[in-house]
């Protein structure tokens, strides 16, 4: 069971992108995206 590299949440933020839910259950694993 891989751990989510970002945070587990219901909705991703503006500068986040959803990834495979790993161990988030019903939640989405959101990883921050680097912005310039």
Swiss-Prot record:
Any one GO BP annotation for this protein: defense response to bacterium
Keyword entries, A-Z: Antibiotic, Antimicrobial, Defensin, Disulfide bond, Pyrrolidone carboxylic acid, Secreted
Keyword Disulfide bond: yes
Cystine pairings recorded for this chain: 4-30, 8-29, 12-24
Tissue expression pattern: Detected in egg white (at protein level).
Protein name: Defensin-like turtle egg white protein TEWP
Record's keyword annotation contains Nucleotide-binding: no
Protein's cellular compartments: Secreted
Described function: Antibacterial and antiviral peptide. Has strong inhibitory activity towards E.coli and S.typhimurium. Has significant antiviral activity against Chandipura virus.
Chief location: secreted
GO (cellular component) term, any one: extracellular region
Residues with Pyrrolidone carboxylic acid modification: 1
Subunit structure: Monomer.
Similarity field: Belongs to the beta-defensin family.
